[in-house]
UniProtKB/Swiss-Prot annotation:
Family in the record: Belongs to the G-protein coupled receptor 1 family.
Key words of the record: Behavior, Cell membrane, Cytoplasmic vesicle, Disulfide bond, G-protein coupled receptor, Glycoprotein, Lipoprotein, Membrane, Palmitate, Phosphoprotein, Receptor, Transducer, Transmembrane, Transmembrane helix
Lipid moiety-binding region (S-palmitoyl cysteine): 334
Gene for this chain: OPRL1
Species name: Sus scrofa
Function: G-protein coupled opioid receptor that functions as a receptor for the endogenous neuropeptide nociceptin. Ligand binding causes a conformation change that triggers signaling via guanine nucleotide-binding proteins (G proteins) and modulates the activity of down-stream effectors. Signaling via G proteins mediates inhibition of adenylate cyclase activity and calcium channel activity. Arrestins modulate signaling via G proteins and mediate the activation of alternative signaling pathways that lead to the activation of MAP kinases.
Designated name of the protein: Nociceptin receptor
Protein origin, superkingdom: Eukaryota
Ranges of the Cytoplasmic topological domain: 75-87, 147-165, 237-264, 323-370
Disulfide-bonded cysteines: 123-200
Length: 370
């Protein structure tokens, strides 16, 4: 069957699929999951320097992102005061990011070698995690924005709606919705021999030239466009509300916290949109039949794809800078060993001082010989 796109473009752009974060069609009509765009098999030449740069970026993002997101989850689980509705959603976001970051060493190896060496089971797992991350991240940010809208625009109703238990239920629903896509692609994904090299592919059902574009457009709409539209509506209503009143609650401190948390969620959403828009636009344009015609354009596409992964390690940094509670908990965690050592030294000094004082007192009470 004839490819939907010109062969030279696919020979340059594709090899093994494992990179990127938007769905496309490969020459054999296999649908690639979102983060799985960039590689260099099918005989395409990928300069070693570019390979090393991409792999180095992946490893840096993996290490930094895992440390940050694991710390976020630990802080939320460890401290009771951190178990708010907003932080429950943040935990879900960190969990999804942690899962996808764990796939980066495998995807980096795939980039470096130019083929998939890890077998069928791991291929299915990586594909499923990519789709789960894409949908759970978008849905969680949407839920956070709706949660902020309720807190700002309907403060009375928020007392009943915005509870940690209900936020946990929403998180479960988000993963269930993501399973509508995640489970089927895991079933359809497999490591196959394509052009004498092993590729990790998602085989779409026949007729591929119909279901491929339909699937790609649906992924684009439901994982990006619709969530961004809902988020935009929520924040538009919140801005109008915030401009219309001086105090949202009876307390200036509570009002300050509401605005601070709303600003945090807005920044997290903005960074998500900023990181994902470039690759989403690239893939949408390709879906409309316009392909990059230069090596520079292909290189830009590769790094736009990597930018999607960078988003997964930025969120903990945003929490540390924009949320006082997270900042305090992070500082407490990082300074704990030093503080323990200082306390041990202080206790030792006090013990020595006490012994010296006792010795001096004893010497004063002992009668001196005449």
């Amino acid at each position: 069957m004839e490819s939907l796109f010109p062969a030279p473009f696919w020979e340059v752009l594709y090899g093994s699929p494992l990179q990127g974060n938007l769905s496309l069609l490969s020459p054999n009509h296999s649908l690639l999951p979102p983060h799985l765009l960039l590689n260099a098999s099918h005989g395409a030449f990928l300069p070693l320097g570019l390979k090393v740069t991409i792999v180095g970026l992946y490893l840096a993002v993996c290490v930094g992102g895992l440390l940050g997101n694991c710390l976020v989850m630990y802080v939320i689980l460890r401290h009771t005061k951190m178990k708010t509705a907003t932080n429950i959603y943040i935990f879900n976001l960190a969990l999804a990011d942690t899962a996808v970051l764990l796939t980066l060493p495998f995807q980096g190896t795939d980039v470096l070698l130019g083929f998939w060496p890890f077998g069928n089971a791991l291929c299915k797992a990586v594909i499923a995690i990519d789709y789960y991350n894409m949908f759970t991240s978008a849905f969680t940010l949407t839920a956070m924005s709706v949660d902020r809208y309720v807190a700002i625009c309907h403060p009375i109703r928020a007392l009943d709606v915005r509870t940690s238990s209900k936020a946990q239920a929403v998180n479960v629903a988000i993963w269930a919705l993501a399973s509508i896509v995640g489970v089927p692609v895991a079933i359809m994904g497999s490591a196959q021999v394509e052009d004498e090299e092993i590729e990790c592919l998602v085989e779409i059902p026949a007729p591929q030239d119909y279901w491929g574009p339909v699937f790609a457009v649906c992924i684009f709409l439901f994982s990006f466009v619709i969530p961004v539209l809902i988020i935009s509506v929520c924040y538009s209503l919140m801005v109008r509300r915030l401009r219309g009143v001086r105090l949202l609650s009876g307390s200036r401190e509570k009002d300050r916290n509401l605005r601070r948390i709303t600003r945090l969620v807005l920044v997290v959403v903005a960074v998500f949109v900023g990181c994902w828009t470039p690759v989403q636009v690239f893939v949408l344009v390709q879906g409309l039949g316009v392909q990059p015609g230069s090596e520079t354009a292909v290189a830009v596409l590769r790094f736009c794809t990597a930018l999607g992964y960078v988003n997964s390690c930025l969120n903990p940094i945003l929490y540390a800078f924009l949320d006082e509670n997270f900042k305090a908990c992070f500082r407490k965690f990082c300074c704990a060993p030093t503080r323990r050592r200082e306390m041990q030294v202080s206790d030792r000094v006090r013990s020595i001082a006490k012994d010296v004082a006792l010795a001096c007192k004893t010497s004063e009470t002992v009668p001196r010989p005449a």
